[in-house]
Amino acid sequence: MESTIILIIILTASVLGRANSVALATCFLLILKLLNADKFIFPYLQENGLFLGLVILIASILIPIADGKVSYISIRNVFTSWLGIFALLVSLFTTYLSGLGMNYLTIQGHSEIMPALILGAVIAAAFLGGVPVGPMITSGLIALGLKLFNKIGS
């Protein structure tokens, strides 16, 4: 019951904050709980959901290449420009942060911070025009900050 109340609070905040992806995901989980399918589907989602979500996200990003809107020449030009090189470096850093974040949340077991990450994403979507895809990077920044803090404090 407590988890349902928390999900309803997240749903309310995400609807008010216009974070539609968070609202949809929360509704999906609430429906699974209502149908008592959570016992079967939650373990699968917890194990494979991130991977499946990334596959869909990356596929949607690759569509301009797949449908021919991006050519080999334009790709070559991007990688020889300062913007392309900068994008590559930022991508390396954010992908590294995402890995740190996933490790921090899952392997190190700090999933209790997820409500704060979601709320931050919802607030950013509502008031800053953000898109709530950053909890993994945010948790990566937290993990990196803690690593640096521990090194400095040692």
From Swiss-Prot:
Any one GO CC term of the record: plasma membrane
Places the protein is found: Cell membrane
Primary localization class, coarse: membrane
A Pfam family matched in the record: DUF441
Membrane topology designation: Multi-pass membrane protein
Source domain of life: Bacteria
Family according to the record: Belongs to the UPF0756 family.
Protein name: UPF0756 membrane protein CKR_1028
Species annotation: Clostridium kluyveri (strain NBRC 12016)
Organism taxonomic ancestry: Bacteria, Bacillati, Bacillota, Clostridia, Eubacteriales
